[in-house]
Amino acid sequence: NYLVCECWTDQNTYAKYYESGVDSMFDFAFADKSGIIANVMNGKASATSYAKNLETEQGMYAQYNPDYINAPFYTNHDMGRSAGYYAGENSEAQTKMGNALNLLMNGNVFLYYGEELGMKGSGKDENKRAPMYWNKDGNAEGMCKGPADMDDFRMKFDSLEEQQEDPDSIYNYVKQVIRVRNQNPVIARGTTAYLEQYSGEQCFALTRSDEN
């Protein structure tokens, strides 16, 4: 059996829940529009802060449960979707990189549906739970209706059908990152070491290693 739990609070508080023996806790410190990933991508925090926090949180969690498995995520059904965190000409690149920073964390990573497309959805909860954007035609086969009180809004990026045909799309970028993760199990299972001498405001360096 595997159990992952949610405690939407500060990192020091949810870290203590590992003492209960639970396998995983959702890692809220890196998630949402005010989390570490979005702050780095928006220039509100240094790139170094991402790597430093990856290294630091290992000891924070292990002190309560040496066998913990981190549960990173970027957004969920209660948060605005990450494509809405970024504006301007670099927003697509930021959306891609933000997904990569989540997907390359260690542990068991969670990806909320539609993040791989850069779907929009913010404000009231119904908007955050918009139906999967399979096709730009809302009446196409397989398309679902959104929650009854969802606002009528346009997506920022193309549908899955369109992105599948574009090698440079967010969807295909995310697929490539997941492929790299799956081909290198040490990414999920290894220990992170932050390399200060190679890191700074705009870039970071780290290693991920295990006994092999």
Stretch-by-stretch model annotation:
Residues Y2-L3, D67-I69, N106-F110:
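Loop/turn elements at helix/coil->beta-strand transitions in domains of secreted/extracellular proteins
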Residues N1-Q11, Y17:
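Acidic/aromatic-lined carbohydrate-recognition and catalytic surfaces
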Residues W8-T9, M25, A31, G35, ...:
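Loop/helix patches that line or flank the sugar-binding groove of alpha-linked glycan CAZymes
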Residues Y17-S20, M41-K44:
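Short, surface-exposed amphipathic charged segments that create phosphate/polyanion-binding patches used
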Residues Y14-Y17, S122-K124:
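A short acidic (Asp/Glu
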Residues G21-D23, D67, N127:
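Short, solvent-exposed loop/turn segments at the edges of secondary structure
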Residues N42-P66:
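Glycoside hydrolase catalytic-domain groove-lining segments
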